[in-house]
């Protein structure tokens, strides 16, 4: 099975953290490609392919049957994390949705899943919101990556439970503490692109005293300072 570059990056991040006895739930699994791949590659022992809609879950069941993984990949219908309450899940992956929706899913049931020690998350937008919520609620960022799939850039973030009192900054939430430190090429490309977009916004604002102009100008300076600090 060949995964998309986005899913392949997520799988690689999971592999770095998983042991053979870990059980993973993939939330919003769509076709079930990720959990099937992880089990097939012996990265994890058991996976739960979870989705809120019958259609995607039916596609997952087809993938599971085609790969003859019925004993190791279990499809579950339900909203967010609810289907895995009471299951021996130790890792959770959520990808392909916005950051606000992702946080809503985590807020609803994560507190009931004390055995979950690792989250592997890929938000399409608003990654800062995911970082801020989890880092303020007993989780730390232990790994980050950025991947290009077709014309889109995606950030993958790995969180672990922690008792440590780690002081993250707003810059950590916005840019990612590890990505900001390492600044891989795709990270630079993402934020250089953002600067171009914001400069076009500046050019469209005639009133330089307008709050939007001041805010956009401040954002540009911040991004350029981050990029020049490496």
Regions found by a protein language model. Give the residues of each.
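Class I S-adenosyl-L-methionine
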Residues: 3-8, 82, 100-230
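Conserved class I S-adenosyl-L-methionine
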Residues: 20-30
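Conserved SAM/SAH-binding beta-strand->alpha-helix loop
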Residues: 53-55
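Short SAM/SAH-binding signature in class I
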Residues: 88-96
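S-adenosyl-L-methionine
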Residues: 1-19, 36, 58-87
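Conserved SAM-binding loop of SAM-dependent methyltransferases across substrates and taxa
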Residues: 31-44
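Conserved SAM-binding motif I beta-strand of class I
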Residues: 46-51
